Amino acid sequence: MAKEQKEVRDLQEGNYVMMEDAACQINAYSTAKPGKHGSAKARIEAEGVFDGKKRSLSQPVDAKIWVPIVNRKQGQIVSKESDTVAQVMDLETYETVTMQIPGELDIQADENIEYLEFEGQRKILQE
């Protein structure tokens, strides 16, 4: 598994974090100190990278949390099977995989794209 542990205080907006066994990108991060005898708490709001679900989490800032290592890769569209599915070839390994095309993205065969990959899940990024 491509993930590591970090303290919650080391996170910031735009980072990735594991929430409910899904890789999520942090949209909002805030900390609050509850009082004289309490540790600071962090509130994290994030959106799933591959499923789009919104999730939130509240943890002490010194707690450890899993952070996924999401790879950003370059690929080339080999062919379009339909308007929503395409064959993509990784430009480093020359491996060919089938991916969903986001609805508002208009791509053609032989175009170069950028995509995210984590534990067998892949998503084409919008330009």
Swiss-Prot record:
GO terms for cellular component: cytoplasm. Its main location: cytoplasm. Coiled coil: none annotated. Transmembrane segments: none annotated. The modification Hypusine is found at residue 36. SMART domains: eIF-5a. Pfam families: IF5A-like_N. GO terms for biological process: positive regulation of translational elongation; positive regulation of translational termination; translational elongation. The keyword Nucleotidyltransferase does not apply. Keywords: Cytoplasm, Hypusine, Initiation factor, Protein biosynthesis. Functions by promoting the formation of the first peptide bond. Belongs to the eIF-5A family. NCBIfam families: eIF_5A, PRK03999.1. This is Translation initiation factor 5A. It comes from Halobacterium salinarum (strain ATCC 700922 / JCM 11081 / NRC-1) (Halobacterium halobium).
